[in-house]
Amino acid sequence: FLHPGSHKNQGIEKGLNLIVEGLNQIDVSNGQMICIETMSGKGSELGCDLNQIAYIISNASIPLYVCIDTCHLFSSGIRLDSFDDYLDEFDKLIGIEKIKVIHCNDSMMPFGANKDRHEKFGKGLIGESDLFNVIFNEKLEGRPIILETPNDLDGYKIEIEKIRRKFHELREN
């Protein structure tokens, strides 16, 4: 997973071109998969909107993919209660097949705050319902989901059980 980085006040275009230049130096001949992670947009951070990610993917000479991070999306101003709209736009600009993995976590920070502060599943400002919108979205079926919540092993166990219960509930209905 690649956090694209920041342009450090050099401008978005220059920053994106430097990222592409760096990526073009990577040898992926052994089958490595590089996933650009969606970002929250703090400071001069890049990769917080689809146009920036599309630019990087379309200008790099190596195959690139995407990791969607729920906290980062929420913090960058993407509503997860209308996640299908985001996926439709993603598909138009980049292609939904480029999404390879989801980092699932709640957010300590309010919507659109452009700050990256992960919270335990369902304990933050995104909430369980919107996180389930992402986890159980049919357009993303079969992709791995990684819990990136601030937790210990027992906490992860509780979160996994919560998700598992919802999965079984949805299958029964």
Where are these regions (language model features)?
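Active-site-proximal loop/turn and secondary-structure-junction residues that shape catalytic pockets
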Residues: 4-8, 38-42, 70-74, 106-108, ...
